[in-house]
Amino acid sequence: MVELTWMTGGKQGSGIDVALGLFSRLMMKFGYNIYGYREYFSNIKGMHSFFTVRVSDKKIASIPSTVDMAVFADTESVLGEKNERGEIVHEGHARDIKKDGLLVVDSKLEKAKIGRNDIKILDIDFDSIISGVAKKFNKPTSDVVIAKNIICVSASAYLLGFDHDAVVEAIKSEFAKKPQSVVDLDVSVSEETVEYLKTRNGELASETINYMKSKGMTPEKILKNGDQGQQIYMEGFASTAIGKAIAGCKMQIYYPITPASDESVFIEEHPELGIRVIQPESELAVLAMTAGANVAGVRASSSTSGPGMSLMAETVTWAGMNEVPLVLVDHQRGAPATGQPTRTEQGDLMFAIHQGHGDFGRIIMAPGDVEESIEMTAEAFNYAERYQLPVIVLGEKAISQGSMNMSKSTVTAIKDRYRVDRGKLVDEVKAPYKRFEFTDDNISPRIKLGNPNAIFWLTGDEHDEWGHVSEEPTNRIKMMDKRNGKYDRILQDLKPEEKFKMVGDVNNAELLAVTWGGPSAAVIEAVEGNNKVAVMQIKLIHPLPKEAVEILKKAKNTVIIEENITAQLKQHIASVTGFVIPNEILKYNGRLVRYDEVSEALTRVMKGENKVILNGY
């Protein structure tokens, strides 16, 4: 079995984010599965960021709390740092390395300060490598220092025994759009790193103790699993963008906000997706334009985060009143207010269910990983048009800033089986046209703007079947029933796998773990091989699947696992069904849920604890 978790980090703006993609693609090239995650502070430059990449020969979508190997070019990443008031900003990552793991540091750092006698520590003279390359290219050192990220990846690959030619290929691929001079410089840095390490082979042999083999990473495994280019490096924010493209979305309208902006930037950088990107003056304008495009018959969407969701509430209610198909992706982050813009949380669930004033139909759905994000985002457009209502896809930073390998065939399969369903969108009607005609299924024929036989009115007021403002009591009752009467059909139409996922044998399990969204992959991995615990991942949050509720009620014992302080899904289930899940595992420190901390927490619940708060970094 191959199992390695790798970490690097440094100051934001120092180029370390390149190391995440470079190391990940290198591991993919040799046939391994990867899952990477990015943690960073909410400023542009100067604060600490770090990246974790897990490498395995099995499919993965989560990471553990500790790492096998860490490579840092700066002291702060290892020892931590304090702000000007003497408060701890972060505690450093020396503590995150497993016993007998490997830490690679700058030679300026005194090993004694690290305080770990149970790990292997190797020092590298980063400055000598950088200055040597700078001299070779006749450049000032300041122009080359950003290439320390190349040293981190190249040193890691060398210590793990990978062929250096593959590293060079990965560098060329990573910087393919850069000038050739940049590529040449980075390749030279990589080569100088290897030459530097070769001069210390005796020390390396004793330090690493054949580290590659200890992780199960052998040349035979590499050759067997080589992917020959059949794997895609998929980042979470790209998955929702690709889902929109598959659905035939033609407009992405957004206002910049972390972490949602990455999705729109990705779309803009990939015109082949066929989606026009527009950035108006405010979040209010964003959703008004999105709703208007959908009224005109164009599949349009927006993506935002919590503060943007708050500003968009009025337009969501307008879309609900006028039965306008609307797809909105909420990449959740730490809240309330500005909160923690670059940290993860699941604090928007109850808000999404009740966003805006009054009662109207809506669908809330939550993918659990990158692959589900593609498929469920695409389906959101079908749901929106089929049932003529707003659909909110609850993403989160835990997914949007995660990255994993995905086979090209998986993406192709999602695209091939996707069928556009525009519901009751018609091309022709006979006058007089009733846009809000009462029907048996509460869904009226809908037509694009511009048809001379289809004159209708859209207002924020209550209206009759033509759209005229109406305050007549009987009409009010019928219209309220119409807008809110679509849930039974939604629950009937959707397949079980679209609503929730079960893992394990719930009939024989002692505990059923209920979760949603970002923590799902970690929870599922945490119970692998444990027949005492089954997992229910709820994908369709609202309306709540009736079949899932029946399973919950029959389980011997249940626990909710969420990334918020109030167990919002638990609240939702209780308010709809009256069933109260008795146990909670919650994490709300802004950090990713790790599978090993879930495993430990489940053990504590099974021993009688009914509430466990996770605080892993």
Where do the PLM segments sit?
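Thiamine diphosphate
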Residues: M1-K11, G21, R25, F30, ...
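Flexible, low-complexity linker and terminal segments
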Residues: G226, Y233-F237, E385-Y617
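Internal gly/pro-rich beta-alpha loop/helix module
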Residues: K120-N149, V153-H164, V168-S190, V194, ...
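Conserved thiamine diphosphate
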Residues: A70-F72, R343-P390, E396, R417-E428, ...
